[in-house]
């Protein structure tokens, strides 16, 4: 059976800590979408690990870690991550169906961002998915056969010829790209496998599989705050498509949310707080992007968005992250509905334009940092948690009270 860990905000919810905390109970940990535009930060024994492509199970020696087919892979960046770990043989597997991000994709991404101003990381993620959908991409499995790779490269060079000047690729692009693959392919190829068959077999044997999403539900290309979204499907349903596991294989869907809200880049954010309180949340919560180091926009918890995300993903339980960031705030707000042109909205609309938050205010608490038992939480903190559960209709089973792995309450 497989369990899914999925972000139910705009990403950066703390999925990495949760996966790291529970990975010891699983045989496989699988990253199922996105690219190196996402980042997980894990603190283990006082050491911070920033992962961008690697599944969060790499810190557990017994875990097999898979990068599955809907992930887009920068081979250069993945090689750099691999070099930071030892003994990954028979512990890391990359789907032969996963698509390769080329230097051209990053150039195209930067070019398009100048006019679109979506707020992308300019890592080439979107253009790589574009080539995938256009059936012109290069897959990881192509790196295993020099003849096939050469055919794919020649087709790529022909396709981009009209755009070389616009994307500033340079006269030596073809030679440089061939050298790029000569440098990195030998380091990556030993990890490339048919992970679809591997996971189907593991499921049939009853092995435990944890499926780890990147970004968050509200960035989903179809169901998020379009056009300010990522280029992949970020909901739990995409875990099946990427891995080859059928929907019957899914057991628990664990939705991850912070005790407040954040967003990176542009796009609507109804509960954003642009007063000094937003700055306080950013500073205390260390809200800066793992990948880009960009400051995150911060605000209050948005229950309209949270209920929507829980419904989309079929969440069976929630993990509430960074409760301690709200410590010491006398009045804690929660967005319970939107107002738009005089109308109260309790359902999440396809367009958040002109939506303003309707808040309910709770008395704050002094300290929750480092708490590991629910009985040790102050009454006001417990009331806040109960309200979220009641409104969303999903039980909170885990609460994080600091970045440390052990500072976690299980309910």
PLM ranges: what are they?
Residues 1-411:
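Non-transmembrane, aqueous-exposed alpha-helical and coiled segments at domain scale
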């Amino acid at each position: 059976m497989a369990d899914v860990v999925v972000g139910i905000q705009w990403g950066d919810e703390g999925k990495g800590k949760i996966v790291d905390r529970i990975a010891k109970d699983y045989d496989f940990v699988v990253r199922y979408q996105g690219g190196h535009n996402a980042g997980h930060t894990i603190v283990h024994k006082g050491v911070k690990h920033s992962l961008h492509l690697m599944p969060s199970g790499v810190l557990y020696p017994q875990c097999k870690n898979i990068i599955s087919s809907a992930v887009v892979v920068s081979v250069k960046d993945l090689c750099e991550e691999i070099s930071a770990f030892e003994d990954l043989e028979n512990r890391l597997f990359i789907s032969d169906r996963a698509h390769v991000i080329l230097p051209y994709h990053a150039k195209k991404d930067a070019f398009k961002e100048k006019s679109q101003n979506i707020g992308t990381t300019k890592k080439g993620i979107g253009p790589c998915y574009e080539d995938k959908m256009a059936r012109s991409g290069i897959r990881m499995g192509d790196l295993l056969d020099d003849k096939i790779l050469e055919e794919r490269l020649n087709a790529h060079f022909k396709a981009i010829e009209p755009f070389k000047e616009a994307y500033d690729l340079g006269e030596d692009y073809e030679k440089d790209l061939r050298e790029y693959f000569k440098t990195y392919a030998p380091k990556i190829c030993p990890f490339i496998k048919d992970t679809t068959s591997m996971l189907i077999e593991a499921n049939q044997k009853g092995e435990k599989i944890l499926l780890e999403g990147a970004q968050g539900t509200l960035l989903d290309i179809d169901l998020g705050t379009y056009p300010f979204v990522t280029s992949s499907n970020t909901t739990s349903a995409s875990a099946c498509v990427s891995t080859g596991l059928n929907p019957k294989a899914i057991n628990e869907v664990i939705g991850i949310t912070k005790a407040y809200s954040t967003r990176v880049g542009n796009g609507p954010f109804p509960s954003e707080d642009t007063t000094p309180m937003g700055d306080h949340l950013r500073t205390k919560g260390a809200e800066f992007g793992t990948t880009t180091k960009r400051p995150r926009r911060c605000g209050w918890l948005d229950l309209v968005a949270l209920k929507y995300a829980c419904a989309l993903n079929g969440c069976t339980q929630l993990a509430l992250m960074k409760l301690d960031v709200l410590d010491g705030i006398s009045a804690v707000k929660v967005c319970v509905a939107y107002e738009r042109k005089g109308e109260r909205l309790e359902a999440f609309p396809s367009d958040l334009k002109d939506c303003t938050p309707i808040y309910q205010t709770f008395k704050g608490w002094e300290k929750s940092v480092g708490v590991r038992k629910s009985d040790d939480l102050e009454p006001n903190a417990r009331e806040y948690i109960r309200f979220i559960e009641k409104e969303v209709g999903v039980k909170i089973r885990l609460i994080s009270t600091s970045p440390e792995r052990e500072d976690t309450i299980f309910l």
